[in-house]
């Protein structure tokens, strides 16, 4: 039974802050552009300027159901937590891949190895996915924070909505009919272990545990063939929380189809099977034909008997009634037409949207070619980028460094540059590669005297190792952060850097999450003129931003300055005319386009920030951030005070106690959707266990 979406709910933004800096201007521009029907725009916001708050204000003022996309689960989890705080009275939902572990089905012909699909589903995330889709069909004040998994195939929203079991007090329906209806939408009867997606029966009382809940269920009480009343109950205690006048029970799976459609689908699957068997046999592929026939007939039998089978999504083209090559239904189809998309860190996220389709297709083609799947399985896939674009009604790309794709989509760019803390983008200068190490040693000593820290980023692992060894010989307290370092050790390194155990951190990629250190006042980028992933314009701007959390922030780009530019040389004259040069000690030297653009952008932002601070009497203050020991265990001494014990200094019994404590914290972090924290804690537990 279809349900009506409530459309008169309003977004209610709850915050103790008012827009600060240039947030107000950015919010006004974005809202005005949306109300004027602008399809695409970019919010180019410097790091630390409060872009999430701006996004929240835009959602509240436009009142549109909104999809916020992020490029990984960690970032999505952080955004979800922030939006939940801003909108406690609205539906803020979370939609990411529900697999804790996922090994996709695959076939490797070279070794004749078939890898069966193996996965572990996170029940909590599955619940949140169901909550997201049901909210989208019930109301309009919805924000869904999602990873790129939202462009993967999901069942038809029409079938999902049409399958809803709608119940009201006074409604004429027999108890047995309700039980049949619940089984039809993939609910399971379980009178003992009552959990999500189950129902239980006690005489004239049916209790239903929706797939989108984890604590509350509903008790439907019958009087003959009529519903007497419906009550919400707490599952654990059975306590009645109140009566409801309407209950919409959404299916326990997103892949739904009715009985008539199921028979049609099975007929199409059988026809496709017959056609594909003829192809295989005509090509002499008898093993592939036998394999396909056996597997598909088993699935058909399961579909007939149970309405479901393992890997049912591979038949989604037939289930949905789609034509070959037609895009699958996704989360985007559950939104009303007039919805808004916000892409966070768009320079990363849009790249993922582009790459998803090709990787998925290459794997599935192998399965189809060798008789593990019917060719229609190719249509169980993520959207292509152009298909994603066809769903866009209005979109806001959010990034400190928007990518080429976003810049091609729109000329409308709204800037947000002022940090509420008054902090400025750092001063950037170029120095010669010749003598760079001795120069850098001098700069490090200056910072060490002021109890400040230094980041040094190199291009190769060998250079990082050699540089670290040289610094140690020079008496500098230094450590090297490389990709092989485990979570526990990485956390210790960052903490030790902040505490001043050492002064310099050397690495190749210092852009990873969790390496923001307010004590860092100098970032040195070696080989800044070698174009590449971490030396392109965006990579340089992001690395330069590592010094933007300190009021003394300074960045040095070391570049090849072997030859000064000569105005009389035609080639040099061309470089001078292009502007891609820098001055050093009265001479002009060539720099790369990326260096020039990164330096110009940083200087432009800094000028705007300085002017704003001067006008409003703001003095930049280095961010004060508590230094915590993530691997310390606390225990009470005789005096009742807490003391910290280092994990490496513990005995086996103490380490066991620490593991127990960390496991509890890990579960709490996962429940709070702090997936990065939970993952770090998990890795710490594994490493502590390895000590024993």
UniProtKB/Swiss-Prot annotation:
Q: What is the superkingdom listed in this entry's lineage?
A: Bacteria
Molecular function (GO) terms for this protein are: ATP binding; ATP hydrolysis activity; DNA binding; excinuclease ABC activity; helicase activity
Q: Where in the cell is it found?
A: Cytoplasm
Query: Which segments constitute the UVR domain?
Result: 656-691
Q: Which UniProt keywords apply?
A: ATP-binding, Cytoplasm, DNA damage, DNA excision, DNA repair, Excision nuclease, Helicase, Hydrolase, Nucleotide-binding, SOS response
Which SMART domains does this UniProt record tie to the protein? DEXDc (SM00487), HELICc (SM00490)
Give every Helicase C-terminal domain span.
436-631
Q: Which Pfam families match?
A: Helicase_C, ResIII, UVR, UvrB, UvrB_inter
KW Nucleotide-binding (keyword) present: yes
User: Is Protein transport a UniProt keyword of this protein?
Assistant: no
Q: Name one GO cellular component term.
A: cytoplasm
Q: Where is this motif: Beta-hairpin?
A: 98-121
- SUPFAM superfamilies per record: C-terminal UvrC-binding domain of UvrB, P-loop containing nucleoside triphosphate hydrolases
Chain positions recorded as ATP binding sites: 45-52
Record's InterPro entries? Helicase/UvrB_N, Helicase_ATP-bd, Helicase_C-like, P-loop_NTPase, UVR_dom, UVR_dom_sf, UvrB, UvrB_inter
| The Helicase ATP-binding domain, residue ranges | 32-187
Give the GO terms filed under biological process for this record: nucleotide-excision repair; SOS response
**Function of the molecule:** The UvrABC repair system catalyzes the recognition and processing of DNA lesions. A damage recognition complex composed of 2 UvrA and 2 UvrB subunits scans DNA for abnormalities. Upon binding of the UvrA(2)B(2) complex to a putative damaged site, the DNA wraps around one UvrB monomer. DNA wrap is dependent on ATP binding by UvrB and probably causes local melting of the DNA helix, facilitating insertion of UvrB beta-hairpin between the DNA strands. Then UvrB probes one DNA strand for the presence of a lesion.
Into which family does the record put it?
Answer: Belongs to the UvrB family.
Q: How does it assemble?
A: Forms a heterotetramer with UvrA during the search for lesions. Interacts with UvrC in an incision complex.
Anything noted about its domains?
A: The beta-hairpin motif is involved in DNA binding.
Record protein name field: UvrABC system protein B
Which organism does this record belong to? Lactococcus lactis subsp. cremoris (strain SK11)
Gene name tied to this protein: uvrB
């Amino acid at each position: 039974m279809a349900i009506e979406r409530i459309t008169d709910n309003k977004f209610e933004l709850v915050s103790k802050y008012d827009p600060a800096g240039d947030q107000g201007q950015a919010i006004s521009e974005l809202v005005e552009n949306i109300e004027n029907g602008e399809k695409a725009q970019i919010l180019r916001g410097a790091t630390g300027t409060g872009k999430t708050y701006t996004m929240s204000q835009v959602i509240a003022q436009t009142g549109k159901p909104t999809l916020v996309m992020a490029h990984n689960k960690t970032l999505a989890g952080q955004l979800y937590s922030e939006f939940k705080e801003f909108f406690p009275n609205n539906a803020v939902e979370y939609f990411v891949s529900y697999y804790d572990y996922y090994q996709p089905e695959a076939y490797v012909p070279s070794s004749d190895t078939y890898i069966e699909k193996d996965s572990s589903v996170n029940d909590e995330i599955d619940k949140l996915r169901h909550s997201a889709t049901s909210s989208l069909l019930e109301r309009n004040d919805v924000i869904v924070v999602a990873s790129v998994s939202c462009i993967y195939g999901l069942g038809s929203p029409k079938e999902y909505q049409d399958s809803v079991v709608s119940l009201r007090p006074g409604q004429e329906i027999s108890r047995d009919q309700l039980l049949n209806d619940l089984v039809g939408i993939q609910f399971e009867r379980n009178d003992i272990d009552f959990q999500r997606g189950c129902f239980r029966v006690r005489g004239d009382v049916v209790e239903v545990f929706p797939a989108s809940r984890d604590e509350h269920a509903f008790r439907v009480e019958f009087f003959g063939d009529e519903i007497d009343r419906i009550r919400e109950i707490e599952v654990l205690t059975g306590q009645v929380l109140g009566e409801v006048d309407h209950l919409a029970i959404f299916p326990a799976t997103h892949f739904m189809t009715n009985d008539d459609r199921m028979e049609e689908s099975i007929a199409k699957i059988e026809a496709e099977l017959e056609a594909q068997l003829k192809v295989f046999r005509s090509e002499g592929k008898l093993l592939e034909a036998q394999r396909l026939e056996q597997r598909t007939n088993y699935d058909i039998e399961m579909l007939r008997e149970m309405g479901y089978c393992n890997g049912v999504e591979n038949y989604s083209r037939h289930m949905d009634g789609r034509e070959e090559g037609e895009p699958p239904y996704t989360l985007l189809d559950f939104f009303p037409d007039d919805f808004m998309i916000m892409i966070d860190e768009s320079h990363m996220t849009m790249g993922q949207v582009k790459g998803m389709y090709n990787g998925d297709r290459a794997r599935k083609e192998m399965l189809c070619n060798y008789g593990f799947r019917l060719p229609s399985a190719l249509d169980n896939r993520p959207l292509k980028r152009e298909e994603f674009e066809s769903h866009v009604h209005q979109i806001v790309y959010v990034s400190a460094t928007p990518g080429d794709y976003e810049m091609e989509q729109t000329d409308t760019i709204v800037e947000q540059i002022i940090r509420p803390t008054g902090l400025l983008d750092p001063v950037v200068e170029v120095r010669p590669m010749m003598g760079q190490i001795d120069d850098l040693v001098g700069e490090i000593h200056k910072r060490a005297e002021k109890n400040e820290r230094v980041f040094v980023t190199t291009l190769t692992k060998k250079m990082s190792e050699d540089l670290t060894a040289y610094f140690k010989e020079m008496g500098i307290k230094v450590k090297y952060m490389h990709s092989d370092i485990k979570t526990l050790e990485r956390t210790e390194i960052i903490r030790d850097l902040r505490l001043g155990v050492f002064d310099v951190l050397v690495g190749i990629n210092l852009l990873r999450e969790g390496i923001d250190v307010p004590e860092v006042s100098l970032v040195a980028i070696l080989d800044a003129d070698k174009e590449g992933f971490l030396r392109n314009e965006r990579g340089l701007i992001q690395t330069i931003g590592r010094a933007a959390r300190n009021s003394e922030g300074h960045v040095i780009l070391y570049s090849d300055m072997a030859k000064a530019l000569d105005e009389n040389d035609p080639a040099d004259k061309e470089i001078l005319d292009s502007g891609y040069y820098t001055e050093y000690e009265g001479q002009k030297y060539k720099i790369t386009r990326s260096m020039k653009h990164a330096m110009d952008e940083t200087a432009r932002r800094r000028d705007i920030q300085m002017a704003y601070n001067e006008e409003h009497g703001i003095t930049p203050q280095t961010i004060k951030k508590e230094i915590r020991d993530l691997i310390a265990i606390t225990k009470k001494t005789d005096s009742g005070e807490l003391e910290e014990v280092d994990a490496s200094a513990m005995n086996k019994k103490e380490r066991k106690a620490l593991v127990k404590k960390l496991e509890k914290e890990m579960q709490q972090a996962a429940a709070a959707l702090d997936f990065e924290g939970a993952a770090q804690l998990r890795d710490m537990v594994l490493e502590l266990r390895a000590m024993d």
